[in-house]
Amino acid sequence: MTIPSASKTLVTVYGATGSQGGSVARSLLQNTEFAVRAITRNASSTSAQNLKALGAEVVQADGWNKSQVQEAFSGSWAAFVNTNSEDPMFMSDDGPTEFDLGKIIIDGIVESGSVEHLVYSSAVSTSAFTQGEVTAKAAEMKSRVEKYAMATGYFKSVCPVYAGWYMELFNNTDFARVFGGFPKFPDAEGYLTLSTPRWGAKTDMPVPWVAVEKDFGDIVHGVLLAPERYHGKVIPALSDASSFPQVVDAFQSATGKNVRYVRQAKWDMFGAGIPELEDQRRLFHFGELTNGKYFGDEPTSTTVPAYLKAQAAKAKNKGVDDEAELLTLNQWFRSGFRQ
């Protein structure tokens, strides 16, 4: 490990009560080498108090207030930052952007004067990889913040982590309706039907799926054990790589339920008529044009995250299989959908 060992090393998590940040905080709190500071907009929330009970220092700060950000990160050795792309304020074309927020946070971290390593939840530049043909707003904003952080020249390492599709999406009833009913609502013929455009150009390419609660935090934890090794390198955060037809196979194997996959003819059919899903439609278009290059030039493979997960398990002194190995879709479906 490259982290100092004289005393606990402070890692501050921005967005600590969100799904990504919470997973990171909980993982790091199991490593006696680390102290965790959790930044939240509401320190009295249940999620914040749960982190406090686990041993985190909880501080309240507004990401739009640079002086508050600066104070919140003061004394930290490393930072994990994720901003909420789905915040309603970012939906307007003439309102503030996620880049605006990210820039303030990066500036505040730099001015805190102590943070050496930044792990930033980023995404591929859809515009760059399609020569401007597709621009998925959320991915583009995150990519711009990543580049801005790198351009400051301040950090010893900037480690961009690209999160795959959340397995937890399948728990969301609204998304189930968009997905064709899968995995919650049988259709008129009694099937749980998963319906999406193709991910890929002419064949079904693997989609990166991440178990956010169980795996994402450990992947980031693994990065923070040797952050300079990952400076400027895309870190694919996924637990399983399975095409949409393979998702159906995994669910059927795990539950024995009647299930099928129905491919939508065009990328723009996904969630048609729902403005909030425009970015997801553009992402399918991106997948078609790039043949499923979700992570850009980094392959959709579990090799890197599996290594990072195993390293985190060692650091937590938890070498048992369910702590050291990534969760497969089959395992995830078995844990939540088998009757």
Curated annotation (Swiss-Prot):
InterPro entries: NAD(P)-bd_dom_sf, NmrA-like, NmrA-like_oxidored
Positions with a binding annotation for NADP(+): K142
EC nos: 1.3.1.-
Entry's Gene Ontology molecular function annotations: oxidoreductase activity
Coiled-coil parts of chain: none
Metabolic or biological pathway: Alkaloid biosynthesis
Spans traversing the lipid bilayer: none
GO biological process terms on file: alkaloid metabolic process
Application notes: Campesine G features good insecticidal activity against the global honeybee pest Galleria mellonella, which supports its future application in the development of biopesticides.
Domain of life: Eukaryota
Sorted UniProt keywords: Alkaloid metabolism, NADP, Oxidoreductase
Reactions this protein catalyses: didehydrocampesine A + 2 AH2 = campesine A + 2 A
One CC-aspect GO term: nucleus
Family: Belongs to the NmrA-type oxidoreductase family.
PANTHER family: NITROGEN METABOLITE REPRESSION PROTEIN NMRA FAMILY MEMBER, NMRA-LIKE DOMAIN-CONTAINING PROTEIN-RELATED
Known role: Oxidoreductase; part of the gene cluster that mediates the biosynthesis of campesine G, a dimeric indole piperazine alkaloid that shows good insecticidal activity Galleria mellonella. Within the pathway, cpsB reduces the unstable (S,S)-trypyl-valyl dihydropiperazine (didehydrocampesine A) intermediate to (S, S)-trypyl-valyl-piperazine (campesine A) using two equivalents of NAD(P)H. The non-canonical non-ribosomal peptide synthetase cpsA catalyzes the first steps of the pathway by producing L-tryptophanal and L-valinal from their respective amino-acids.
Protein name as annotated: NmrA-like family domain-containing oxidoreductase cpsB
Species, as recorded: Aspergillus campestris (strain IBT 28561)
